[in-house]
Amino acid sequence: MRYSPSDLFHLLRTPVGRSQLKEGLQHRAWPVYSRLAGRHRRALRGHTRIVAVVGSYGKSTTARTVACTLGADTNRVSARNSWSHVAKALLAVRPQDPYGVLEVGIDGPGQMAEYARLVQPDLVVVTSIGTEHHRSLIDLEQTQSEKAEMVRVLDANCLAILNGDDPNVAWMADQTRA
């Protein structure tokens, strides 16, 4: 995404334009941040457990509750939960932390699989699956499949906590080895 100097000037003059520029930069920074975060995640293996909170609704509250329960720093749980923000949140987890809690959201198809490969969670919490993503995903089934990518990467020694009250989440029990 390239802008002429006059486009930049006009975008910088409005809050919406500044937000648009910032999001564009976050998206473009993803390749760099994701490589750094991937190396960092490998360094965390063995002494820091990573918890990923996914779902259409309730991620922020759930992530903060999980962090508080585990004694993790709730100030490092970011509600900004896509693209570079996921990588930055992973980079914020310190090697001496026993747990890191990440809120992971998506804006479109294919993203959750990328995040799952990057985050390599030890525990996944799936809150709910709803129609919030219909602007970027075709239907509820595509949303379910996309969100399930995070539980599909779990090994047998990992844990998936699924909302059994939501049939759109409960079916994921068959999608994981955990």
Predicted regions and their residues:
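Phosphate-binding loop of NTP-binding sites
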Residues: 4-164, 168-177
